[in-house]
Amino acid sequence: MCSSDLNYIYKILDGNQTLHPVLRTDVAPYYRKLNINLMNEAAETLLGENDFFSFCRFREKATTVRKLEKFDFHRNEDGVIVGEVSADAFCYSMVRGLVGAVVHVGEERFPVSWVREVLEKRERQSESLVFAAKGLTLVGVDYPEDAKLLERANLTMSRRSSTEED
């Protein structure tokens, strides 16, 4: 089956905060303090249908064009940064690559415009950080109605250009 949307959350505890033992397996610790406003500005520049080659691990015959529907961050009541990421499909390591790039902006290593520049270069960046799998959780899969499952599967698996419409 092929989904219509995949929904992930990514939890980060920044600034060397003390990690509660219960959260140990669910949250990625990060030693620097992050600016969520800058992270959200950078994330917003990636929304829509784009070729995310720069943020994906290469896989033979796989498309890297995806439609990123949601990518934003907030801090919860425990002080944990929660990133919400939704798309029609994800390439291998794409969520971890996107979060890593936005974290670089959040720590003010690069300007907000940098993530869009990385996207448009269509090449893996040595500066780009692929975040650890710890902290990443699949929270939902939304399927299209039965009549559209095959159409959705074919679109997701086909090679497509970033100018095609869904």
List each language-model region with its residue ranges.
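Structured-RNA-binding interfaces characteristic of tRNA pseudouridine synthases
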Residues: M1-D166
